[in-house]
């Protein structure tokens, strides 16, 4: 069993934005999002999710256009179909798009749907577009373009329509604590940084024609981000806004109240100095952010629980 990398590509800025939205959709907006640990960029497809043990793959093709016709959708499915007929098994095949024409859906209120919500006439046009595009691709064998394969493939495809702003996708990263960041410009800046980091993975090395024998070998080419990478980047940018300018956090008041009033200012200044030193100490920055990530994750888990102890 093997997999040959074909049709990797460089993406325009608009396409990169859609791919980042797709990444954050995989990471935060699915019932199985917690299973996905790696986000592999432009290797199997535009984006592919992988679990920690490389047992499961979630395949994503993205297209930012808003009014995709049924036939256009069919053509966009070609790389997903390529992976459907390959030796590797994928858990899900996702077409992430900016929008579809009003002739596609039975229920236009559903923005995540399978073939059961596509009109019969649109299904036929999707098949026509897929067959036409598949026949033009050298990486798909004519013998694989059969009615049986296409019907089985379409039964497994999920179409997801992008219905959120970049800032809304970033909010899903800090779910459980929505008031952590309120400024739209901060959220947009975080999204752009995730987008740029994701896009930079395409430039690491040429992989066209690479052959791998197992799914986990894809990680050796370093074209991936992890869920922790994205969460930590987000947390760093939030903390680095200006953690000192806003004064003493309410949650810190019980600790401050144990200090003699005449020492308040000195104590606060000492804490702020220590925080600044930790933030900008390059020798221990990795350990600091790893600790802070764990503290933050525990805070999200226990955010709704009453405080039992005062430190």
State what each model feature region is.
Residues 9-13, 17-82:
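Catalytic centers of nucleases
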Residues 1-12, 64-300, 304, 308:
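Acidic metal-coordinating catalytic centers involved in nucleic-acid phosphodiester chemistry
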């Amino acid at each position: 069993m093997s997999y040959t990398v074909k049709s990797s590509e460089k993406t325009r800025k608009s396409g990169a934005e859609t791919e980042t939205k797709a990444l954050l959709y995989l990471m935060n907006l699915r019932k199985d999002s917690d299973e996905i640990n790696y986000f592999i960029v432009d290797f199997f497809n535009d984006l592919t999710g992988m679990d920690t043990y490389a047992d499961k793959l979630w395949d994503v093709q993205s297209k930012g256009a808003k009014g995709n016709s049924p036939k256009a959708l069919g053509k966009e499915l070609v790389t997903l179909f390529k992976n459907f007929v390959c030796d590797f098994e994928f858990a899900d095949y996702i077409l992430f798009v900016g929008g579809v024409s009003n002739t596609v859906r039975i229920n236009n209120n559903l923005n995540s749907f399978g073939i059961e919500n596509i009109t019969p006439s649109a299904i036929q046009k999707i098949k026509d577009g897929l067959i036409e595009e598949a026949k033009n691709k050298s990486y798909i064998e004519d013998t694989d373009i059969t009615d049986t394969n296409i019907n089985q493939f379409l039964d497994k495809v999920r179409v997801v329509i992008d219905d959120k702003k970049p800032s809304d996708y970033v909010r899903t990263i800090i779910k459980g604590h929505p008031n952590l960041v309120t400024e739209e410009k901060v959220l947009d800046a975080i999204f752009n940084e995730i987008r740029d980091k994701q896009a930079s993975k395409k430039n690491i090395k040429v992989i066209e024609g690479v052959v791998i024998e197992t799914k986990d070998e894809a990680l050796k080419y370093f074209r991936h981000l992890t869920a922790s990478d994205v969460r930590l980047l987000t947390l760093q940018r939030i903390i680095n806004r200006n953690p000192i300018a806003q004064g003493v956090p309410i949650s810190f008041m019980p600790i401050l109240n144990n200090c003699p009033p005449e020492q308040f200012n000195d104590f606060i200044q000492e804490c702020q100095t220590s925080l600044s030193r930790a933030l900008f100490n390059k020798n221990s920055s990795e350990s600091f952010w790893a600790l802070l990530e764990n503290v933050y994750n525990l805070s999200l888990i226990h955010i709704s629980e009453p405080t039992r102890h005062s430190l």
